[in-house]
Amino acid sequence: KVGDIVSAETHIICGECEFCLRGEGHICENTKIIGVDTDGCFAEYVKIPAMNCFVNSKDANPLHLSVQEPLGNAVHTMGHFPIEGKDVVVVGCGPIGLMGVNVAKAYKAKK
C-alpha cells in the first residue's frame, strides 16, 4: 500500500509455463528481468507485480535494504556452483563482485 517500503524480486515469471505450473518459477522459460527485459528501477516510479514485492519493516534502515538485490546476485551465483574447498576468481570489483568475494568465503571457498 502507499507508504510501504518494499523490496522486489527482479525476475518476473510468467505463471503459465510448465515450470511455473509445477511451482518451479525459478526456472521459468519466459522470465523477464527488470532492467534487462523491461525498464529498470532508476526512476521515480516503477511498476512491479505485487507478487514480486515484499514489505519491509518500517524500522528497517533503507541503506541496509539497498544491498538486498546485489547481494542476492552474489549469493545466487556462488550458490550455483560447488565452490567449497576450491579457488574462486571474481572478475570485477563493483558492488556485486565485492559481495561475491565475501559470499565465496561464507561458502568456504579455499581462496
What are these regions (language model features)?
Residues 1-18, 57-60:
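Glycine-rich beta-strand-centered segment in the early N-terminal region that forms part
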Residues 12-30:
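Local cysteine-cluster metal-coordination motifs and their immediate loop/turn environment
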Residues 44-64:
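Short Fe-S-cluster ligation motifs
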Residues 60-111:
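Mid-domain Rossmann-like dinucleotide-binding core that forms the NAD(H)/NADP(H) cofactor-binding site
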Residues 1-7, 26, 43-46:
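Signature of N-terminal electron-transfer/Fe-S-associated modules in redox systems
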Residues 28-33, 40:
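Short cysteine/histidine-rich zinc-coordinating motifs and their immediately flanking basic loops
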Residues 18-19, 37-49:
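A structural motif shared across PLP-dependent enzymes of the aminotransferase-like
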